[in-house]
């Protein structure tokens, strides 16, 4: 690997390397690890925790082949399979604020009329609170159904507005997370947080690939950060096609 360019390619997971909450295809996995990694350094950055990333990357062995794995926006950092850093939102904002956010979110969601509601509406992670109006235990069909409903009725966008208004004096940020949820995290703990683990001298360039790169999306900040070259993708297949073009892979 000594002949690799001193460049890091960072990839979002959902919508970029996989369909939302699904496994990476065998074709794209092999392409990344055999073709892309032989040319540049590769890393993952996701709002999900380590176990979910491992599931989507088709196992821990595959996950650990990436040079960097930034879980929960980089608040948890693995380098070549070794845990390097881990922090907690609870330590940062405290129990009182945490409960205020959760109580408000549950109250707001209780008034929503949706095509379906299931379970696991609030998920506590090291770096964030993940809030899901339909419930994370929904089936794939229910997930897709909510996603279509959300695009029409702006359920999550309105939810973000309500959270921002309620907690405007807090040091918290709110963003659309993946396909069905809202992420709540300390301001500055978006995906740009992962860049704090990469020294300025480590790479000549850092390229980021993501699908939620417009304002309000959870890729927006890192996509627009001065330290990265941002690339918007529309699907895992589009990611592959762009990589083939940038790296001259036939």
Residue ranges and their predicted role:
Residues 23-120:
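Active-site phosphate-binding/coordination module
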Residues 2-5, 25, 185-250:
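Mg2+-dependent phosphoryl-transfer enzymes with acidic/Ser/Thr/Gly-rich catalytic loops
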Residues 37-41, 169-173, 203-204, 226-228:
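A generic structural motif
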Residues 3-10, 27-40, 166, 201, ...:
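A short, Lys/Arg-enriched amphipathic alpha-helix followed by its capping loop at the start of a domain
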Residues 115-207:
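Conserved acidic, metal-coordinating active-site core of Asp-based
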Residues 11-14, 72-74, 125, 132-136:
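Short loop/turn segments at strand-loop or loop-helix junctions that form parts
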Residues 18-22, 47-48, 184-186:
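Short, flexible loop segments at the rims of nucleotide/cofactor-binding pockets, characterized by
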Residues 4-23, 69, 195, 219:
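Asp-based phosphoryl-transfer active-site loop
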């Amino acid at each position: 690997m000594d002949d690799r360019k001193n460049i890091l390619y960072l990839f979002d997971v959902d919508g970029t390397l996989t369909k939302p909450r699904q496994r990476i295809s065998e074709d794209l996995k092999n392409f990344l690890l055999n073709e892309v990694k032989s040319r540049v350094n590769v890393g993952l950055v996701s709002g999900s925790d380590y176990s979910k990333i491992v599931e989507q990357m088709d196992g821990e062995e595959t996950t650990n082949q990436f040079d960097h794995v930034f879980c929960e926006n980089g608040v948890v950092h693995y380098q070549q399979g070794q845990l390097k850093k881990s922090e907690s939102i609870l330590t940062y904002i405290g129990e009182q604020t945490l409960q205020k956010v959760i109580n408000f979110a549950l109250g707001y969601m209780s008034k929503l009329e949706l095509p379906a509601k299931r379970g696991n509406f609030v998920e506590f992670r090291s770096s964030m609170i993940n809030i899901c109006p339909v419930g994370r235990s929904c089936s794939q069909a229910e997930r897709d159904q909510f996603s279509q409903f959300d695009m029409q009725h702006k359920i999550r966008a309105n939810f973000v507005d309500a959270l921002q208004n309620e907690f405007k004096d807090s040091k918290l940020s709110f963003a659309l997370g993946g396909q069905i949820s809202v992420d709540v995290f300390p301001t500055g703990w978006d995906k740009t947080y992962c860049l704090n683990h990469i020294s300025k001298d480590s790479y000549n360039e850092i390229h980021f690939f993501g699908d939620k790169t417009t304002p309000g999306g959870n890729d927006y900040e890192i996509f627009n950060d001065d330290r990265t070259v941002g690339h918007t993708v529309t699907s895992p297949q589009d990611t592959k096609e762009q990589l083939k073009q940038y790296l001259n892979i036939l």
